[in-house]
From Swiss-Prot:
InterPro entries, sorted: Homeodomain-like_sf, Myb_dom, SANT/Myb
Name under which the protein is recorded: Transcriptional regulatory protein DOT6
Keywords assigned: DNA-binding, Nucleus, Phosphoprotein, Transcription, Transcription regulation
PROSITE patterns, per database record: HTH_MYB (PS51294)
Protein purpose: Component of the RPD3 histone deacetylase complex RPD3C(L) responsible for the deacetylation of lysine residues on the N-terminal part of the core histones (H2A, H2B, H3 and H4). Histone deacetylation gives a tag for epigenetic repression and plays an important role in transcriptional regulation, cell cycle progression and developmental events. DOT6 binds to sequences containing the core CGATG, which resembles the PAC (Polymerase A and C) motif.
Residues bearing PTM Phosphothreonine: T489
Molecular function via GO: sequence-specific DNA binding
GO cellular component: chromosome, telomeric region; cytoplasm; nucleus; Rpd3L-Expanded complex
């Protein structure tokens, strides 16, 4: 210790100058010659000097001279190790630590330590050492090793010596004997940290140079290049890391590869920045609004995800928001409209009911099936060129995207009815069935066909979600009361079923009767029962061929449907598809059977509760209309029920041969 303190005043002065860049810049030129001389002296004496006060003095002098020549902030790797040991292991105060570094002020020591911890000294491998796990006895010899390192002719020689010096380093004297040899026997004497501030002083010079070396444990400082300060000047890139980048984490051992260390330092170094970005991410969230405005934001979000976490979070927002935007802005209706392109394109013009399209979202699959059938039948109807009904949309308002203007042809309405028949989409009938809204002809046609489908009121309520079972029952009763006129005579213009049903093919007089019956049907009036009585049997016979066609199509549709969707054959007599579903369906004959009979289900009805409800409602709400045979409406509910049951049973039997069975049924009913 006394030896280290015996450094000449000039060397001390120079070392102190090193700590101050300005002073150093002022004094650097005058001392350059002296520093070179001191270096030469150190080199000359290095091979022969024993571990003695003279050797330590020369080493310290050379170190101090180097300090003067080097950046004032330069530290010897051994000084760095000692500094870290004193601060991190012994938890000493900066003022006490500065005593081990006579040329360093407490602030200089603190600044150096911060730079080491921050990873800003990327090239300095002492920063890579985990001082807590450092095995070599940290001794003030680090400064000595610095001198040795300074005397090393080249990095390569030093690197070769590093491993050898490691063991020696632990025992090296506090002030290394200036020698280029890798082994530093002189160091062994004072390897113990004498911890005199003077011992470390010379070491401060070599800190950066040591870092450039693959810094094996403490031995590396001894192996540092002869002119570490030159090395620093020639390798400015070693300080590419920004200060504070690694200040928070230094756990790597000194043995760790500097490259690996630098990578880790970079990772750690970015952590504070990442935190900064994360703090900004709070501002990034408001940006989601802008992102949501652009549906293409999901693409940008992918780009953002590749970047930092704040952008990733922002990208997540943009992704979700864009999805929400598409769903919110265009509304579910648009997506539903887009689903069946062909159908939606056909009905783009008909958006009057589009505001209610959301109701159709639930059954998109079924609707798609409906739309397929609907498209086919629409084409067929367009080819047939049936008369147009200004009142009925092809689809109820629930199929808003499918709705046609009221000016749409009856064929379109019948097509709607067919599409409805093809599936259990209660949405199609729902809007039209609202009691507040007059029953649409589509709904009436559906109910009329339900007579043949033998659908229960519950099933009808599913088909007509906007209508309650009571309403449907009432309407069925009304239609059944008017069925005589409605089923055969209901003009295609008035009802979709007319168009789809063979009834459409009836004579003009029959259609006239049907028109009147339509009006009366809505009113629940049965004044045209006689006309229907006249029409039904013949009309049934006429429709037999048509009904077979529709029944086959309807049966196909029913097979497609996930649930036993009621197949609404355009023909009132179309019972083929109804046969399979008759058990669960209310026997609804579009024929003269009263609405009560219509509400009545087949004896094998799967829903006895529905049957009871229908019977009660029928008995309470409406007197069943007489069949065409009876001009009076006084036919009892039981009679109509029996007739309907018979007709339904015959219908079931007639699924295979719908025409003769229907005719027979009507004859029986008449």
């Amino acid at each position: 210790m006394s030896i280290s303190t015996s450094l000449n005043s000039a060397s001390i002065h120079l070392s102190s100058m090193d700590t101050h860049p300005q002073l150093h810049s002022l004094t650097r030129q005058p001392h350059s010659s002296s520093t070179a001389m001191s270096k030469n002296e150190a080199q000359e004496s290095s091979p022969s000097l024993p571990a003695s006060s003279s050797s330590s003095t020369s080493a310290s002098a050379s170190a101090s001279s180097k300090n003067s020549s080097k950046n004032p902030s330069s530290w010897d790797p051994q000084d760095d190790l000692l500094l870290r040991h004193l601060k991190e292991v012994k938890k000493m105060g900066w003022k006490d630590i500065s005593q081990y570094f006579p040329n360093r002020t407490p602030n200089a020591c603190q600044f150096r330590w911060r730079r080491l911890k921050s990873g800003n000294l990327k090239s300095n491998k002492t920063a890579l050492i985990d001082i807590n796990t450092y095995t070599g006895p940290l001794k003030i010899t680090h400064g000595d090793e610095t001198a040795n390192a300074q005397q090393k002719p080249s990095k390569k020689v030093e690197e070769n010596v590093l491993t050898e010096d490691t063991a020696e380093f632990t025992t090296t004297s506090s002030i290394p004997i200036p020698s280029r040899k890798t082994s530093l026997p002189s160091f062994h004497a004072s390897m113990s940290f004498s911890q005199s501030p003077s011992n470390v002083t010379p070491t401060t010079i070599v800190s950066n140079a040591a870092s450039s070396m693959p810094f094996a444990p403490p031995t590396l400082p001894a192996a540092l290049p002869h002119h570490p300060h030159q090395h620093l000047h020639h390798h400015p890139h070693h300080k590419t890391l920004k200060p504070r980048s690694n200040s928070h984490s230094f756990t790597n051992s000194l043995n760790q590869d500097p490259i690996v260390r630098s990578n880790d330092e970079e990772k750690y170094g970015f952590i504070p920045k990442v935190f900064v970005r994360s703090r900004r991410s709070s501002f990034a969230y408001p940006q989601q609004v802008a992102i949501t405005t652009t549906p293409s934001s999901p693409n940008s979000s992918h780009v953002l995800l590749s970047s930092k976490s704040r952008r990733g979070s922002l990208a997540n927002w943009s992704r979700r928001s864009s999805f929400n935007v598409s769903s919110n802005n265009t509304s579910r209706r648009s997506s539903m409209i887009l689903a069946p392109n062909s159908v939606s394109n056909i009905f783009n013009v008909n958006n009057s009911g589009s505001n209610t399209a959301s109701t159709s979202n639930t059954n998109s699959r079924r609707e798609s099936v409906i739309k397929k059938e609907f498209q086919q039948r629409l084409n067929n109807l367009s080819n047939s060129g049936g008369p147009t009904s200004n009142n009925g949309p092809i689809f109820p308002n629930s199929y808003t995207f499918m709705d046609l203007p009221h000016s749409s042809s009856v064929s379109s309405s019948s097509t709607l009815h067919k599409s409805k028949r093809g599936s259990f989409s209660g949405h199609s009938m729902k809007s039209s069935c609202n009691p507040t809204n007059l029953w649409s002809k589509d709904e009436d046609a559906l109910l009329m066909e339900n007579k043949k489908r033998n659908l229960s009121v519950m099933e009808l309520s599913i088909l007509l979600p906007q209508r309650t079972e009571v309403e449907i029952q009432w309407r069925l009763n009304a239609l059944s009361s008017d069925a005589d006129m409605l089923s055969p005579t209901h003009s295609p213009q008035k009802t979709l079923s007319k168009k789809t049903c063979p009834r459409m093919f009836k004579s003009g007089s029959t259609t006239d009767d049907d028109k009147g019956s339509d009006k009366e049907d809505v009113m629940g009036d049965g004044s045209n029962d006689d006309d229907e009585d006249n029409v039904d049997p013949l009309h049934r016979a006429k429709q037999s061929s048509n009904k077979t066609v529709f029944s086959s199509s309807s049966s196909n549709i029913s097979s497609k449907d996930v649930s036993p969707d009621p197949i609404f054959s355009p023909d009132p007599a179309d019972d083929s598809s109804n046969t399979s579903d008759a058990g669960s369906r209310c026997t609804i004959t579009s024929d003269t059977s009263s609405s009560a009979a219509t509400m009545n289900r087949t004896p094998n009805s799967k829903n006895p509760q529905d049957i009871a409800l229908l019977n009660n409602f029928r008995s309470e709400a409406i007197t069943p209309r007489p069949k065409p045979s009876s001009t009076t409406t006084s036919i009892t509910t039981e009679t109509t029920n029996n007739m309907i049951n018979h007709s339904s049973s015959t219908t079931t039997t007639t699924n295979n041969s719908p025409l003769p069975s229907i005719n027979t049924i009507f004859k029986d009913m008449l």
